Structures are given as structure tokens and as C-alpha cells.
Amino acid sequence: MATDDDSFPWDQDSILSRDLLSASSLQLCYENLNRSCVRSPYSPGSRLILYAVFGFGAVLAVCGNLLVMTSILHFRQLHSPANFLVASLACADLLVGLTVMPFSMVRSVEGCWYFGNTYCKFHSCFEGSFCYSSLFHLCFISLDRYIAVSDPLIYPTRFTASISGKCITFSWLLSIIYSFSLLYTGANEAGLEDLVSALTCVGGCQVAVNQSWVFINFLLFLVPALVMMTVYSKIFLIAKQQAQNIEKMSKQTARASESYKDRVAKRERKAAKTLGIAVAAFLLSWLPYFIDSIIDAFLGFITPTYMYEILVWIVYYNSAMNPLIYAFFYPWFRKAIKLIVTGKILRENSSTINLFPE
């Protein structure tokens, strides 16, 4: 991130001398080109370890989220408005693993961008689009869980497939339009022309964002985050109250309708708890990054490169977390994975298999 504050003088010669210091003794991204960026000074062993760690995250994000999408879209038992939101969220995380993480892996390890200036812009746009899409999906999922837990019997009539589709469309359109309008047009660099010119070298792919847009980015994170925290606080208060009521009723003879309502409420509370953990993981992954963005925007690139890379990869790894959370808490997801990896979903009528034997 960058700043447009005049109190930070950016001199092209001083920055280049800092970044290209002792360039003759260092490896360059492009040895035969002037103004080439300097490669990261990692040893071969360190490079191998970093590639393994980052590559594992990318593979996990792609394979894990592909399993989530396949499970929900294939098995009819999982065809519900809420699960379609989860499948769309998995699609956003899958695209992070496909279009963002592999290229960021090379940039982080080598310190060089070998994929051209055009894809550098697209890479930044994809990064913003898919990550904001995940945020908006999680916000809508939290609202869905609140409705389901607060009144589980009328929930199916309130959160319909039509409403789910509108939430999905909104999440994708807003995130894509915003990210491309900001990053592909270069609006984020307004007022930072001298800084961008000073930092530009062949083999680099850096995104400079002025203070105004950094603040707007932070608000786009903060508002949904506050909504999610508020909603899940209410959900757990309702869940606690329901648990107390069920305990009281267990000492009495309950009518059949009450028993059914209790079972439904219990199922919805469990779903809310699991998705609440996914939301918490998302917020914990993203909050340090946005705080650092604000600090850098107003204090001027004080974050060390290695620390910034750590924060970015914590964000990326969040795209691989949700499938692990589902696998840990959802028996139906574990069963679906087994059916998928063993090839049993290719059998006739496999979509009607019961994933909820209980």
C-alpha cells in the first residue's frame, strides 16, 4: 500500500538506490534488462520450503472447495438456498486458489513477476474481487443463520431460492465492479504518480493505493464484519435461550410438534455454530491485513516486506480453511467426500444417496 501524503517525500533515485543496492552482487529478475527488479535473496533450500508451503495452500484451496461445490451441487439432499450460498462462497475461494495463489507464490518466493503487466493488473483485480465476494457471502450467510435459528419453522418461507440467488448475484457483481473499477482503471494510484514511477522496475507487480481508497477498502471490510459479529452474538444468545428451554421441557411431556421444533432448532444451531467458526476464521485472517494497510497508508511503507508477505498469505490461506472446518464439523460432508473420491458419485442415482442416516 502507499500514501498520497506530501509529508513522505519519494525520490526516484533514492528509492532505486535502496532497492537496487549492490545489484551487481545480487540476482536480477531479468539479467539483461535495465531497471530490473532484484530477486529475493533466498537460498535454494528456503525457496523449496516456501514453494511447498504456498503450493500446498493453493492445492488445498482448489481441491477442498471443489469438493464442497461438488457435494452441494451433486447431492439433492444438499440442494437448499443456504447451501447454494455456501457453494458460491466455495467458488470464490476456489478461484483464489486458481487465479491468485499460484502467481503470488512465484512473486513471494522469487521477488519477481514473470507473467506480464496485463496479468499483473488482472491478478490484483481477481484478488480484490474474489476476496470481497467471500466477505459478502459470509455476511449473507450470517443473516441466513440468524433467520434459521430465531424462527426455524417459518425459515424456509423467508429465505427462499430466489432470495439466495439475489444475495449471490449481489456478492459477485459488487465485488467485481468495485475491484475492476478501482484497480484496472488505475484510480487507486491517483496522486501517487511519482511514487509509482519510483517503485516501478522490470519484473515487479506492486499495487499502490492512496489514502482515500485504503479507507474505503477498510470500510468495505469493517461494515460487513460488524454486521456478522452483531448477528452471531444474537444467534448465540438465542441458542443459549433455546437450550435452556429445551432443558426445562425435557422434564415435562412435550407435544409432537414441540419435539419436531426442538429437533429443527438443534440442527440449525449446529449449522450456525459451524458457519460462525468459518466467519471467525475469516475475520481473524483479514483483520491484521487491513490494519496494516491503514498503517502503511498513513505512515508510509513502514511494514517490512517479509511481514507484509506473511499477512497476505494468511489471507490467502483462509480460502483453504472452510473445507477443513466443514470436514471437521459436518459428518455429511465427510461422507460426501468419501463418495466423491471413491468414484461412487458416478453411479446411477448417486445424487439421491442419503447423507443424513440419522
Swiss-Prot record:
GO terms for cellular component: plasma membrane. Residues 1-47, 105-125, 188-211, 296-309 are extracellular. One of its GO terms (molecular function) is trace-amine receptor activity. The lineage of its organism: Eukaryota, Metazoa, Chordata, Craniata, Vertebrata. The keyword Membrane applies. One of its GO terms (biological process) is G protein-coupled receptor signaling pathway. Belongs to the G-protein coupled receptor 1 family. The chain crosses the membrane at residues 48-68, 84-104, 126-148, 167-187, 212-232, 275-295, 310-332. This is Trace amine-associated receptor 7c. It is a multi-pass membrane protein. Olfactory receptor specific for N,N-dimethylalkylamines trace amines. Trace amine compounds are enriched in animal body fluids and act on trace amine-associated receptors (TAARs) to elicit both intraspecific and interspecific innate behaviors. Ligand-binding causes a conformation change that triggers signaling via G(s)-class of G alpha proteins (GNAL or GNAS).
